[in-house]
Structures are given as structure tokens and as C-alpha cells.
């Protein structure tokens, strides 16, 4: 259960970061309304708060989170931006998740 909870927390954290960065990208690259910067800032604030909910040291959390970020970014690429994924995308995502698992599931030393 703990693994599922951590994985979901990583996924939600990644979504808030991607939304917080994608909306300004729309403003800058596609000339969308400046009002998109308001939900972008809110999303990034939620992202920062979510990072505090992870159960391990900040650096380790960021390292493990990176693997989930890669996967969520590729899902975003496919479903939001409409770009097809390649076998290299799938291979890279698999490797990133493996790295995340190694970091996140390591035995914790309390010394």
C-alpha cells in the first residue's frame, strides 16, 4: 500500500509541475492569455507543497521523483500535445522508473 501511495503522490506532484510549466509555455510560445499565469503559479505552489509530503530526505525525493516525472511528461506529450511516442520513449521511461524504484525502495538506515 505504501508503494502505491508514494507512486500516486509522485504522479500528482509531476502533474502539478507540468501544468505549472506548460501554461507559461503557452503564454510565451503561443501567445495565449496572460491570465494563464495565475493558475500556473498556483499549480507550482501546490507542486512545492506536495514535495514536502514525501517521506524521505529532500534530495532523495527529488531524485526518485525524476523517474516519475519522465513518465508523466511522456503521457502528457501523447495525450495533451498529441505527439506519438517512440520505442525510445518507452525504453527511456522504463529505465527512469527502474531508477526511481531503486532509489525509492532502498532500505532506510536510521543511523
UniProtKB/Swiss-Prot annotation:
InterPro entries: UPF0060. The keyword Transmembrane helix applies. GO terms for cellular component: plasma membrane. Disulfide bonds: none annotated. Pfam families: UPF0060 (PF02694). The keyword Transit peptide does not apply. The chain crosses the membrane at residues 8-28, 33-53, 65-85, 88-108. SUPFAM superfamilies: Multidrug resistance efflux transporter EmrE. It is a multi-pass membrane protein. Keywords: Cell inner membrane, Cell membrane, Membrane, Transmembrane, Transmembrane helix. It comes from the Bacteria. It is found in: Cell inner membrane. Coiled coil: none annotated. Belongs to the UPF0060 family. This is UPF0060 membrane protein HCH_03337.
